[in-house]
């Protein structure tokens, strides 16, 4: 684990002076690493109150995600809050993905209203929690998640958008992956 932390720090330290590291601060290990990095521009995102880009008031409804985007003040700017952000893809993990993209877009100088409109028009990626059919209130999704962590995230997103029963059908992708991660696969459900 120490090797992983050192590799992450080396990666951040290799960012050129004109670049920035956009990092999810929700993980305690990442929080400890950030405090050890000097002379690099760090932009954080996540659900944590310490994040530079933070989602609040998150609501999942009808396979959509609604939230507010809060941008913390920096030396050269004031705090901002963008209400009524809407995403067509559910799941806390997707909210975190959206926050990372918003962070990058703002860093590149893209207007917040353009970011909001782009998010509203984004339908997701094919076979990543794609709604295939809605039959008599039963929603059928397709997701290519083939790793236990991805499967857990998809099932979590499923449970966030319904109070009803969630049924998952899995097709193991690779024998060696299944064999090596069998315990993780069995606990993913």
Name each model-derived stretch.
Residues 1-140, 163-164:
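Acidic, Mg2+-coordinating active-site environments of NTP-dependent enzymes
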Residues 1-2, 35-39, 154-156, 181-185:
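Short, glycine/charged-enriched secondary-structure capping and boundary segments
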Residues 1-5, 148, 178:
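A conditional alpha-helix N-cap/helix-loop micro-motif detector
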Residues 32, 105, 150-151, 179:
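Short, function-defining helix-loop hinge/capping sites that tune catalysis or transport
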Residues 92, 109, 146, 173-174:
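Short, glycine-/Ser/Thr-/acidic-enriched flexible segments
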Residues 100, 146, 150:
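Conserved cofactor-binding/catalytic machinery of classical short-chain dehydrogenase/reductase
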Residues 125, 149, 155-189:
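Active-site beta-alpha connecting loops in nucleotide-dependent enzymes
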Residues 140-146:
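Switch II (G3) loop of P-loop NTPases
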